[in-house]
Swiss-Prot record:
<dbReference type="GO" id="GO:0031929">
    <property type="term" value="P:TOR signaling"/>
</dbReference>
<dbReference type="InterPro" id="IPR001680">
    <property type="entry name" value="WD40_rpt"/>
</dbReference>
<dbReference type="InterPro" id="IPR036322">
    <property type="entry name" value="WD40_repeat_dom_sf"/>
</dbReference>
<feature type="repeat" description="WD 4">
    <location>
        <begin position="119"/>
        <end position="158"/>
    </location>
</feature>
<keyword id="KW-0677">Repeat</keyword>
<feature type="repeat" description="WD 5">
    <location>
        <begin position="161"/>
        <end position="200"/>
    </location>
</feature>
<dbReference type="GO" id="GO:0031932">
    <property type="term" value="C:TORC2 complex"/>
</dbReference>
<dbReference type="InterPro" id="IPR020472">
    <property type="entry name" value="G-protein_beta_WD-40_rep"/>
</dbReference>
<feature type="repeat" description="WD 6">
    <location>
        <begin position="211"/>
        <end position="250"/>
    </location>
</feature>
<dbReference type="InterPro" id="IPR037588">
    <property type="entry name" value="MLST8"/>
</dbReference>
<feature type="repeat" description="WD 8">
    <location>
        <begin position="295"/>
        <end position="315"/>
    </location>
</feature>
<comment type="similarity">
    <text>Belongs to the WD repeat LST8 family.</text>
</comment>
<keyword id="KW-0963">Cytoplasm</keyword>
<feature type="repeat" description="WD 2">
    <location>
        <begin position="33"/>
        <end position="71"/>
    </location>
</feature>
<keyword id="KW-0853">WD repeat</keyword>
<dbReference type="GO" id="GO:0005737">
    <property type="term" value="C:cytoplasm"/>
</dbReference>
<dbReference type="InterPro" id="IPR015943">
    <property type="entry name" value="WD40/YVTN_repeat-like_dom_sf"/>
</dbReference>
Length: 315
């Protein structure tokens, strides 16, 4: 399954489903914990395993076998774990949670263990890794946006808006921008500047977008860094051109929350997850869904899709 084009989804029905992206067929269903929805999913860089997080749990599943139970349960996790992701070589994983901490997990050791911790002094809703593989962007419920250098332990902190909770953060693949979206429908963008004599990137305020009328749930940059995506509780996923941050497209799933999304490697297609329990594949040029992935019985709150292997083969 490692080289297949697969989509993984998870949500409020306590299951994680693995789909053939090109057919819409569900090829595997894995049980999550009965006490939590799935908050985030990420596939390991070698594409053999899938990590999932939720309330007081982080689990790692094997995609190569028929086993539907997790192969690793991470110990000692408190409160809600909101985000996770992998360093590009798979040597470590980061997680963010409502225990106020962003943690670095050593994935080479057996079993994996927490090797480093950053205290945000407030529940952490979001975290993302800079393409330089050294800095992590973070957003907290008290409105702070952090940039943390994992190696030097230095960090920068900005509060873009008072009395607003940061719901998601994203860093563009070219490393030029950091975006943070909040519960008031606003998305803030900073230019990331660095020079040889600097220890870490600095954040320069660049743009504020009044992106949605309601809660923003996710923000993500396209792989080519030309688009910024925001998804919301207002039933839309909006795409903004990073050249001037003007709106380019609006995808509508009326009356439902759009919880998560993922781009294809060529930045021409988008997967969305929504509260109607359906994942959709959209062709961005036409603004229309071309495929639906149905099988979840409740809202889908997280998805993961990576097709870099196919892209490399084609090139």
């Amino acid at each position: 399954m490692g080289d297949q084009l697969i989509l993984a989804t998870g949500g409020y029905d306590h299951t994680i489903k693995v789909w053939q992206a090109h057919t819409g067929n569900c090829i595997k269903t894995m049980r999550f914990v009965e006490t939590s929805q799935v908050n985030a999913l990420d596939r390991t860089p070698d594409k053999t395993r899938l990590a999932a997080c939720g309330y007081q749990c982080i689990r790692l599943y094997d995609l190569e076998s028929n086993c539907t139970a997790p192969v690793i349960n991470f110990d000692g996790v408190q409160k809600n774990v909101t985000r996770l992701g992998f360093q590009e070589d798979g040597n470590w994983m980061f997680t963010a949670g409502e225990d106020h901490h962003v943690r670095i997990w050593d994935m080479i050791s057996a079993p994996p263990h927490c090797s480093r911790v950053f205290d945000c002094e407030s529940p952490v809703n979001a975290a993302c890794l800079h393409p330089n593989q050294v800095e992590i962007g973070m957003g907290s419920q008290n409105g702070n946006v952090f940039l943390w250098d994992v190696k030097s332990e230095k960090h920068e902190c900005i509060v873009p808006e008072v009395d607003a909770s940061i719901q998601d953060v994203a860093i563009s693949p070219d490393g030029h921008y950091l975006a943070a979206a909040n519960n008031k429908g606003n998305c803030y963008i900073w230019s990331l500047c660095s020079s040889p004599d600097q220890k870490m990137s600095t954040m320069r305020p660049t743009k504020k977008i009044q992106a949605h009328t309601r809660y923003i749930l996710r923000c993500k940059f396209s792989p080519d860094s030309r688009l910024l995506l925001t998804t919301s509780g207002d039933g839309t996923a909006c795409l903004w051109k990073t050249s001037d941050f003007s709106k380019w497209r609006e995808l509508c799933i009326e009356n439902y929350w759009v919880w998560d999304a993922a781009f294809s490697a060529d930045s021409k297609w988008l997967f969305t997850a929504s509260s109607d329990g359906v994942a959709r594949l959209w062709k961005l040029e036409t603004k229309t869904p071309t495929r639906e992935y149905t099988g979840h019985t409740k809202a889908i709150t997280a998805l993961s899709f990576k097709d870099e292997i196919i892209r490399k083969v084609n090139h």
